Design a protein with these regions (language model features):
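Fe(II)/2-oxoglutarate oxygenase catalytic core
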Residues: 1-155
Length: 155
């Protein structure tokens, strides 16, 4: 089963910042299985953030929980892997500063909360839920962590 969100050929859009939009990024049967097995109760059991509107289940939990549907463990494992990291860097190679000096060395990449402190680049895969808010949006314009090289969203 191919869980790679970049399995379709895509072009980097440069304006207003380097990004990609991939319609139907996963085969429908894979997406449907992820949707049908989404661990809503587990995500909602985490400590709420952002004044109680945001719940996050991070890679350290997704990679360790034995009761989790296998597809979610595999999805998280792939999207925190060296292979995934390399594919994203390859896609955005013209836009990533050379100062990062990654040199494609596997021991420099590890999943946040799972890898030890010796890695240079930490990856993460999170399941996030926001409380429904009817008056306004729960996410105003913002910058994520300035230490992040990239972030991706799957809806």
């Amino acid at each position: 089963m191919n869980l790679n969100l970049l399995q379709k050929k895509t072009t980097v859009i440069k304006d207003p910042y380097p990004h990609v939009v991939i319609e139907d990024a996963l085969p429908w049967d894979v997406y449907e299985e992820l949707e049908n097995t989404f661990p809503e109760n587990a995500v909602l059991s985490t400590e709420p953030l952002d004044q109680g509107i945001c719940y996050r289940w991070k890679a350290d939990k997704l990679l360790q929980e034995v009761y989790k549907p296998q597809i979610w463990r595999e999805f998280c494992a792939y999207h925190t892997s060296v292979e995934w990291f390399n594919s994203v860097l390859e896609l955005f190679k013209d836009d990533i500063p050379p100062q990062l000096n990654y040199n494609n060395q596997a021991h420099h990449v590890g999943a946040r909360g799972w890898a030890d402190d010796s890695v240079t680049f930490w990856t993460d895969c999170q399941l996030v839920m926001h409380k429904p808010i009817t008056e306004t949006t729960s996410r105003t314009p913002h910058l994520d962590n300035p230490m992040e090289i990239f972030a991706g969203l799957l809806y």
